[in-house]
Every structure is written in C-alpha cells, then in structure tokens.
Amino acid sequence: MNVTVSNEVTDELLGPFELSDDITLMDFMALIDFDENEQALWHNMRQLKSVDREKTLMQLGIVGESLVVVKAIKKKATEGSTTRASKASAKAAKAAAKAAAVARDTPAEQATTVSPVAQVPVAVSPAVTAAVPTQPTSPSGGPAAANDIITPEDEYIETFRKSLLNSPSLASNIPIPGVNQLIQDSQLFKQLIGPVLLHRRAQQQAANQMGTAQSEYVKLMSNPDDPSNQARISELINQQEIDEQLHKAMEYTPEVFASVNMLYINMEINGHPVKAFVDSGAQSTIMSTALAERTGLGRLVDKRFRGIARGVGKGEIIGRVHAAQVKIETQFIPCSFIVLDTNVDLLLGLDMLRRYQACVDLKENVLKIAGIVTPFLPEAEIPKHFDMDPSAEATNLPSTSPLGNQKAAPEARDAGVGSALLNRSTPATAERTHAEEDVRRLMDLGFSRAEVLKALDHSQGNAEYAAAFLFQ
C-alpha cells in the first residue's frame, strides 16, 4: 500500500510511503514521528484512536492509495489560539482578495473555465480525506443556516477543499490551471471536483482483498465456514493467482502468446514440387489423394491397406503407396505413404524420420536427413490452408498435426494425425486363419505371435507384405 501523510500542524506533505500490509498503527506512528499528546490521526473522516495501536493498517481500512491527515488536538481557547485564528483569517482575506483581483482581470467566459476534472491525479484524489469539521458548514464555507441540508457527501467535499486550502503543497500536486482560485470557491469546487472525489471514494470503498464487489465480500466474510462460501472464496483466490500468472507472463515472457510457425520443407515427387509438413508426432508418412493423382502415384495405391486413422477424430485410409522416389535438395530417397483424403499434401511422419535418422535442428532451423541439410520454410511460404479458422480454433480439440479438416468422415474435421494410431486393417470380415508355417517363419524374425497375426491380417495372408509391415 502507498500512504501519504498530510500534516496540518506543520503544513507538510509526507510520502507517499510504500508500506507492507502487516504494519501496525504503532509502527506507523513511529515512522511519521507522531505526538499523541498534541496530535490526532484521521482517515476517511474517522479518527484513529491510540487503543487501536496494535491493529494493522489494513484492519483499520487503510489500503491501496490512502491519505492520513495529522491534525492538532483542540484545546481551550488561549491567547495563542486567538493569534493563530487572526493569522488564518488574515491569510484567508488575502487569498480572497487575490481571487477577486484575478476574477476582475479574467473575462467572464474564462472565469469558470477549468481543465477537465478527469485530470485530477489518481494518486491524490482516490483517498484524500480529512477530519470532520468542528461544526456543520454550509456549501459557501460559513456556518450552516437552520434550513441548510448538509449531506455527508457535501461534508466530505468541503473537508477535502479545506485540506487543500491548509496545505499548499498538497494543492500543488493537482495539475489543474487555476486550482488555487478554484479551491477558494466552494460552490465551483463542489460542482467540478466533487463528482470525481465521490466516485474515487466509492471505488476505494468497493475494493477489497478478494477483488470482488463489496456486497459479495461482506456476504462471504459474514459466514466463511459455509461450504458454498468456502467454494466461492477458493474460486476467487484461484482466480487471483491465475490473473497474477497472466500478468507476469505478459510482462516477462510475452513471446508465449505469439503463434508458432509449423515446420515445412521443400521436396519433389516425380518432378512435382511439394511442401511437406514435418511432424515427428505422426506415426506414419501421409499423402493426400489429390497429391497422389497429381504426381502419378494414384495408380500405385494399394487399396488392400484400407483402414481408419484414429486420433482426436478419425478418417478413412484410402490405401498405401509402398515405394516412391522423393527428392530432398539433391538427394533421392525411397519413401512409402499412407494415402488419406486430406487437405494437406504431404506429412513427413516418424516412420521416415527414424528410417533416415533425421535431426530436427531448431537452433539452425534446418532438417538434417539422409546426409543432407534442408532449411525449414519461412512463414510466408507456408501453405495458407494450414491456418485454422479463428472460431473453430476456440472450440476444436487441440491437434498436433495439420490433418484436422478431413472429408472422409464428419468426425475427421477435428482429427489430428499427429497423435493418430493408424489402424491399417481392412474392414471387419470373418476371422482369417493363416498357414502355421508362415506364422512360425515370421515369429523366427523376433516378433510375437500377436504381432505376426496382426501383420498377416493387414496383408490378407501375404507373408512378404506382412514381413515388410513388421519391419516398419
């Protein structure tokens, strides 16, 4: 909290002091060199008594940006007080004469013109308070007549105005042209500055440590042991921690809120340039049906390998291209593809990355594969169809690959092949039986019986295809 002290005895403005929430009133008194016998502390039109010296400032309602006023303790009229009163009267008369002179020299249109009230600094206006006047005063500043109605709001505004009159240093903190003349006129001060003061005070009174409305805070604190109140308090505390984390992240690591470009490389298939998406989270390398037709590989799709690609959603596998030459930079390498009806031309999956011992070097922004190095494409060259629709991005489940908009099945529009488990089995039919000799021969290669039977099911009993499947 930041506390400013206005000492009306010495006409000084101290602070603001940056204090912890657990500082006691006694420690605060010692900090400002407070004399209990001669002075009194006031905050929000309430005197801070010495009996509360063990309480913290927060318990006494002093939070955020606050002002504490030090006033002299009133004693019986003495010669000294009479002298001070005469000096104050002379000072007020002099100020009034000066204001009148300024008013005479100022055109009528400018006499009541003041800078916008919103310019009152937040550091001063939210919590500037003072003591209650010794007797009710009228808006004009004199004793109240019997038919005058003095509201607490009027008292608050008038007390603030008098604090500025008694503390020129405090008034100098308000960057309004002609403020010294403004505080001489109680009616004009109330009209222009009053609404801002009342609004700031209402904001301060509504604030609390839970960051919620004061009415809800009072309701929660009136019965904190109630299970529903405890749940709400816990929710508010958690929300405060979340907001704090958000603010820290935005201040110290704003880069985490930026979008990340996906990894694409250039390659060629049968002389056709292709932008391939590199996804180490995808189990298999995938080609779209459109690209298969463009590159002349559509006729080589083995539809016996039909199946379902399962991830966040699912999509239909059209078939498989067992081998095709792919050119990356100057290197030709054989590659196999799973063919899906998707809007992404080519996805370079983990099977090919592991096969050629690829290295995704994010520091150098390159892909090292098959003994060559190829750079990842800049953002401007990344296919635009990869970008998700903003409205869909908020509702779709997260996907680690771009295969989110598949046409094979309605569910496949949200499917992510990056986490997909590709089920290459053909549609369910009667359970097949395989030659025991083929099963034993494949098991001798180091695979379990279940893996061998699954591979034979995928290849429709072809032992050679099953062996190729097992070694992928």
Swiss-Prot record:
Annotated EC: 3.4.23.-
Cellular compartment(s): Cytoplasm
Gene Ontology terms: biological process: positive regulation of DNA replication; protein secretion; protein transport to vacuole involved in ubiquitin-dependent protein catabolic process via the multivesicular body sorting pathway
Listed Pfam families: Asp_protease, UBA
Every UBA domain range: 434-472
Stretches with biased composition (Polar residues): 393-404
PROSITE patterns: UBA
GO cellular component assignments: cytoplasm; plasma membrane
Domain Ubiquitin-like: 1-72
Broadest EC class assigned to this enzyme: hydrolase
Record: active site: D279
Main location: cytoplasm
Organism superkingdom: Eukaryota
UniProt feature coiled coil, ranges: none
An example molecular function term from Gene Ontology annotations: polyubiquitin modification-dependent protein binding
Keyword Cytoplasm set for record: yes
Annotated region (Disordered), positions in chain: 388-410
Keyword annotations: Aspartyl protease, Cytoplasm, Hydrolase, Protease, Protein transport, Transport
Keyword Cytoplasm: yes
Protein's job: Probable aspartic protease. May be involved in the regulation of exocytosis. Acts as a linker between the 19S proteasome and polyubiquitinated proteins via UBA domain interactions with ubiquitin for their subsequent degradation. Required for S-phase checkpoint control.
Family, similarity comment: Belongs to the DDI1 family.
Subunit record text: Binds ubiquitin and polyubiquitinated proteins.
Protein name, as recorded: DNA damage-inducible protein 1
Annotated source species: Eremothecium gossypii (strain ATCC 10895 / CBS 109.51 / FGSC 9923 / NRRL Y-1056) (Yeast)
Gene name in the database record: DDI1
